[in-house]
């Protein structure tokens, strides 16, 4: 008998928000039938959370706190990937989208507005 997994909990979460819920989360197995390789597996665990009216800075802080908690629970002092290392307990650098484009792609995003 065929078995099915969600591709994303986003639609169900947005329906709950539209129905008046203010704070929700979903943690569960999801499926994406796309690329497959050492960095991509079709089945994985996804966390999504929403808070109505919350500033994006608070959500960025949530992400930093979540990474620090995951590292602490795993007993890790740092995260390493492809020769790079990050301290999950340090205050993260915050960039605007325009700053990220300039730094990492050499594109002045603001200069393209109205061009």
Q: Whereabouts are the PLM-identified features?
A:
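Class II aminoacyl-tRNA synthetase catalytic cores and aaRS-like
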Residues: 1-115
